[in-house]
């Protein structure tokens, strides 16, 4: 392992007000009850990459060296999967919200899925624009089934490379060694989302200044190797293992040296997801 120093994607913000999320009723939908998502629409879908590297001085946040490596790796990976990739750099929180709102209003009826990758500083439930924080829920809510009807019943993948707190994982040594007769045409508005977080709740997320973040490196490598062979959750399990076993932080600050990381997958997918068909 090359001893280039690792960084974290975190910025502590005090006195954030909690958001109250009101429930919503299900909506009518002609969803098929097959076990896997239909991925043979005319288009695979959009892949939006928001790559925030440089932040306003007023935020006190440092530049995220290595993030351009992640963005380039992601562009190549998802283009190879036939996604239409749109890369946006250094967006303010207002620009992030505006972009996500506009994308959600597009006609996705000929698209199989939707992918959004967020590369930035973060905290639990928060991603940072270049000038301040955005509630992740505010971003993802635009794509709920009752608000983005052309993506209803289709997989919506949010990949988030950012810290979720300030805890450090020191690691530990180990010894190796739906029924057909359910004619339901309503689905929950929060169904068919998947959130792939780079780290567990409350923890730092590591990024190498030369090679990019551990999580994005691993995600792209596993997609390139297995996207034509394995179901997506199986691929993400391999990503978890790669990050957990092959990476360890190197820092001249002893507090941040020899630390570990484990990604966290939160799935509300209702079917298996294969990128091939």
Swiss-Prot record:
Propeptide: 1-9, 10-28
Post-translational modification summary for this protein: Cleavage by granzyme B, caspase-6, caspase-8 and caspase-10 generates the two active subunits. Additional processing of the propeptides is likely due to the autocatalytic activity of the activated protease. Active heterodimers between the small subunit of caspase-7 protease and the large subunit of caspase-3 also occur and vice versa.
Record text on activity regulation: Inhibited by isatin sulfonamides. Inhibited by BIRC6; following inhibition of BIRC6-caspase binding by DIABLO/SMAC, BIRC6 is subjected to caspase cleavage, leading to an increase in active caspases.
Ubl conjugation listed as a keyword: yes
The name this protein goes by in its record: Caspase-3
Highest taxon above the source species: Eukaryota
One Pfam family per UniProt: Peptidase_C14
Phosphoserine found at: 26
């Amino acid at each position: 392992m090359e001893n280039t120093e690792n960084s974290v994607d975190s910025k502590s913000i005090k006195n954030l007000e909690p958001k109250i999320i009101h429930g919503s009723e299900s909506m009518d939908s002609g969803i098929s009850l097959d076990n896997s998502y239909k991925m043979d629409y005319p288009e695979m879908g959009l892949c939006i990459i928001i790559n925030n590297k440089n932040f306003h001085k007023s935020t006190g946040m440092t530049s995220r060296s290595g993030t351009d490596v992640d963005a380039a790796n992601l562009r190549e990976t998802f283009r190879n999967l036939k996604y239409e990739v749109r890369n946006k750099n250094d967006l303010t929180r207002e620009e992030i919200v505006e972009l996500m709102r506009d994308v959600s209003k597009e006609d996705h009826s000929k698209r199989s899925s939707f992918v959004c990758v967020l590369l930035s500083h973060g905290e639990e439930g928060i991603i940072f624009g270049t000038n301040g924080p955005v509630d992740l829920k505010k971003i993802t809510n635009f794509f709920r089934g009752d608000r983005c009807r052309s993506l209803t019943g289709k997989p919506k993948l949010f990949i988030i490379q950012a810290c979720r707190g300030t805890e450090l994982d020191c690691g530990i040594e180990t010894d190796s060694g739906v029924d057909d007769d359910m004619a339901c045409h309503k689905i929950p508005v929060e169904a068919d989302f998947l959130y792939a977080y780079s780290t567990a709740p409350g923890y730092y997320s590591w990024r190498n200044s030369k090679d990019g973040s551990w999580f994005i490196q691993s995600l792209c490598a596993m997609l390139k190797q297995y996207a034509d062979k394995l179901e997506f959750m199986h691929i993400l399990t391999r990503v978890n293992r790669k990050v957990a076993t092959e990476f360890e932080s190197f820092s001249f600050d002893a507090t941040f040296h020899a630390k570990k990381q484990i990604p966290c997958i939160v799935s509300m997918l209702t079917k298996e997801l294969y990128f091939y068909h």
